[in-house]
Design a protein with these regions (language model features):
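Charged, E/D/K/R/S-rich low-complexity terminal regions of large eukaryotic assembly subunits
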Residues: 1-424
């Protein structure tokens, strides 16, 4: 895998963007590839004085001694805290009032850890700093929050980060720290929680955040989470309430959000085409998503398949393959896996190569009582919101009189549709 190099990324910004690729090589025990990529990346970007130790420089005693010596020389006349004093043990040993008094000195020491890639000490120190400090001007802790995020990502240790950032976000409201939580969940691979935090982001994102995440990348991550964990009501909420999304990202990055709109309109054929031709390649190159690219694609297509199956009681393997933009064998395998894992309540007709949904008894009873009314509403609803793929499955559903749960992705399930008289 080629490590993409963007000339706009310098210093630690470059490390944050590409560190996970290096860690993937290291964790896979492909040490030759790992070493090759470290050397290649460090030569290309030259972002540390000790580039070969960019991941865990604190594990090298020789480098640590050199850093300590250089730090003392650099700050000998500034009365800045020594390296040992600035260690997390220092924060453990002093009171809150002393933390406030020495705050600037502590932050300067953490800047040293940060600039020299000593992420272990930076992470532990920032954690204790953020946990103990109270009533400090929010501008003063912004830097510590961002650097805590950076060190957490580099160390791949998410065990403590969420509680402390949640606590900070509740106490300090000048900036929206949900963006930090969103990004941490995304990098960890918890896309469901990332999507939840996305809904809470309103505005006032710390400017320092954009030193590490480009605006275009943020737009891509937003669109990715909306697609991965799509919910029509959530999408409407984002469109209505998320100021940074509406005013800064949505119109500017239609190449991403246009695909979400296709999903919103049930245009599954084009959604899958766009996924295969655009999103898949970007996911494979993204340092924070590339390690999960196969499972992302699998889950995404399975999610669409389950939604398609909720529209009808039977559909052919061929039609499913066309809608998902996969071959028939892969479509068949997906259906079998969903049924065997109890994610799809259906049976397979091997002779006719179709999959048949099991219809609940209560829905059958409802159908018998109100068949004509329901069928008329279904026909109207198809015309309203399902034109993009009606021609693909109409021959599968005509005359079946099936109550389908979710034809209109925009607002209603079937029960809401019947209660409120259709979409507005």
């Amino acid at each position: 895998m080629e490590v993409p190099v963007d000339s706009k990324y310098q210093g630690v910004s470059a490390l944050i963007r590409y560190a996970s690729i290096l860690l993937n090589y290291k964790n896979s025990k492909n040490l030759a590839a790992y070493g090759e990529k470290v050397v290649s990346l460090s030569n290309s970007l030259n972002f540390f004085a000790y580039p070969l130790n960019i991941i865990n420089s604190n594990n090298s005693p020789e480098i640590f001694k050199a850093v300590k010596h250089n730090f003392k020389e650099k700050n000998a006349e500034k009365n800045v805290l020594s390296l040992n004093q600035a260690d997390s043990h220092f924060i453990d040993s002093i009171g809150v009032s002393e933390i406030d008094k020495n705050k600037q000195l502590i932050l300067e020491a953490y800047e040293h850890f940060y600039n020299n890639g000593n992420f272990d000490k930076l992470n532990r120190g920032c954690y204790r700093f953020l946990k103990r400090i109270k009533g400090v001007n929010e501008y003063d802790i912004n830097d510590a929050v961002i650097r805590y995020m950076v060190s957490t990502i580099c160390l791949r240790d998410f065990s403590q980060c969420y509680n402390i950032i949640e606590s900070i976000s509740q106490e300090y409201t000048l900036f929206d720290y949900n963006i930090i939580l969103f990004f941490l969940y995304l990098v960890e691979g918890n896309y469901k929680e990332a999507s939840t935090k996305l809904l809470k982001i309103k505005n006032n994102i710390p400017e320092e955040f954009f030193e590490y995440v480009k605006e275009e990348d943020l737009a891509f991550y937003f669109a990715f989470c909306l697609l991965y964990n799509f919910n029509n009501k959530d999408y409407k909420e984002v469109l209505s309430n998320n100021e940074i999304f509406v005013y800064k990202l949505y119109d500017k990055y239609q190449k991403f959000f246009g695909i979400v709109d296709m999903y919103y309109k049930c245009d599954y054929l084009n959604v899958n085409n766009e996924f295969n031709t655009k999103l898949k390649e970007r996911i494979n190159k993204d340092p924070f998503l590339c390690g999960n690219s196969d499972s992302i694609e699998k889950n995404f297509k399975e999610k669409i398949l389950k939604e398609i199956m909720s529209f009808t009681n039977e559909i052919s393997f061929k039609t499913i393959a066309e809608l998902l933009v996969v071959n028939k064998n892969k479509a068949t395998d997906m259906i079998v896996n969903l049924i065997e894992s109890n994610k799809l309540d259906a049976v397979i007709d091997d002779i006719n190569e179709i999959v048949i949904m099991k219809t609940p008894d209560d829905m059958n009873e409802l159908l018998k009582k109100s068949n004509k009314t329901i069928q008329k509403n279904l026909d109207d609803l198809i015309k309203f919101s399902y034109g993009n793929i009606k021609h693909k499955i109409s021959h599968q559903i005509e005359g079946k009189g099936v109550v389908r749960k979710k034809l209109d992705r925009g607002e209603y399930d079937m029960r809401m549709y019947m209660m409120e008289g259709g979409p507005d």
